[in-house]
Amino acid sequence: VGASEVVVALGPWAHELLFELGYRIPLFVKRGYHAHFADGAMLTRPVLDTEQGYMLAPMKRGIRLSTGAEFASLSAPPTPVQLGKAESAARQLLALGPQVERMPWKGARPCTVDMKPVIGAAPLHKGLWFNFGHAHQGFTLGPVSGRLLAELMMGETPIVDPAPFAPGRF
């Protein structure tokens, strides 16, 4: 496949590819867990327990329990300790139904040392563009990051100052 322009938007896997191309972007992974429980108690609003480090969110078919984050490599096996403690604390607060999925969801959130995404032209390769490193805000920032990158690629005036996100800052 040939292309004059290529976007690297590989989340936590961007580091491995870009290292081979000579880039040393300090990207690390924070990992979090979610578990989905059938309706036990009725929950109409999200509940955040900052002391125990978890959040409960109502869903159409149950309740989603999510935890904070842990530092782990992409290949590290799951560590269910955090999720187990959060589930125990949540069950003291309200009656969670049985867990819907056999295995909880585990997500790797790509983070840079300054906690800002990497968006813009690659400094070493013409036609190579970056859009990754959004940490916990990947779904939230995805649309506006895509817009910013498209504006940069098209030579248009960007919606925001792209300098804080420039790949060359590392």
Where are the regions that the model predicts?
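Glycine-rich phosphate-binding loop signature in dinucleotide/nucleotide-binding domains
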Residues: V1-G2
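Flavin (primarily FAD) binding-site architecture
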Residues: E5-R24
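Short, glycine-/Ser/Thr-/acidic-enriched flexible segments
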Residues: W13, E70, H136
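Predominant activation on well-ordered alpha-helical scaffold segments within soluble catalytic domains
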Residues: H15-L18, E87, R147-A150
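Active-site lid/adjacent beta-loop-alpha segment flanking the redox-cofactor pocket in flavoenzymes
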Residues: E20-F28, F37-G127
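C-terminal lid/capping helical subdomain adjacent to the catalytic/cofactor pocket in oxidative enzymes
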Residues: V118, A122-F170
